[in-house]
């Protein structure tokens, strides 16, 4: 499991399709499918199920999404620190 897979899960749910998520993330639809399949294998459960022509989250998928969003929020905070100049500055005497 990696951050990219969690971003893909979040994007698929947010945009409602693999195609739109792929466009947003600037990757191919097959990359989306491959990465989600790898995430499902890592977690040992299915994240989506077909409902007619649409994909809907399974109960495990809803839990995974909720936790993924927490991780992505924390990741964003940490990445913002990377560029921050919050270290001590000034003149030493």
Walk through the language-model features, giving the residues of each.
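Interdomain hinge and pocket-entrance segments immediately C-terminal to HTH DNA-binding domains
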Residues: 82-93
